[in-house]
């Protein structure tokens, strides 16, 4: 969470500019991320640092895909795949009759907020879209799982939740 987002931006900048010093620093940040096993800490403005968080998973997938683009090292792709798997428990892979927007919708975090309510079971579309973006990145390089299908499902869920007419 706290590490993946900044690392992603540094890796992308290093790849686009060709700056070797920035690339070395960004890749060092990726080595430091290897100690983490649970996606968490990406939404500290509202939620406790320790709670599982799909935004952290999405940022980690994207960061490792960017590291793979920069270096071609298979280990980065393996890490991207790992973080993609950690995000799947946040995605509703089923639906309940009468709740048409449930299927492929995404829960942001598995705990509470610093404020007055729980986020448990409540979808937050934009967090899911960050994760879906990461899955699309991964699908370019990895066909071990239908990552693109999951990403498209999340996108379709987001589209179903938009009002096309009438009051919102």
Task: Describe each model-derived feature in a short phrase.
Residues 1-168:
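Glycan-recognition and catalytic cores of secretory/periplasmic carbohydrate-active enzymes
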């Amino acid at each position: 969470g706290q590490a993946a987002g900044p690392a992603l931006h540094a890796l992308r900048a290093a790849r686009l500019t060709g700056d070797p010093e920035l690339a070395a620093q960004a890749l060092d940040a990726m080595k430091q991320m290897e100690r983490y096993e649970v996606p968490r800490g990406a939404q500290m403005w509202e939620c406790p640092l320790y709670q599982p968080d799909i935004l952290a998973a999405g940022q980690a997938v994207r960061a490792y895909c960017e590291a793979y683009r920069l270096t071609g090292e298979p280990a980065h792709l393996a890490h991207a795949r790992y973080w993609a798997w950690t995000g799947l428990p946040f995605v509703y892979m089923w639906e309940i009759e009468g709740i048409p927007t449930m299927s492929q919708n995404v829960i942001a975090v598995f705990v509470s907020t610093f404020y007055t309510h729980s986020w448990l079971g409540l979808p937050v579309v934009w967090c899911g879209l960050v994760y879906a973006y990461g899955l699309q990145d991964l699908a370019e390089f990895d066909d071990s799982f239908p990552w693109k299908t999951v990403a498209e499902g999340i996108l379709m869920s987001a589209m179903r939740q938009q009002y096309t007419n009438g009051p919102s």
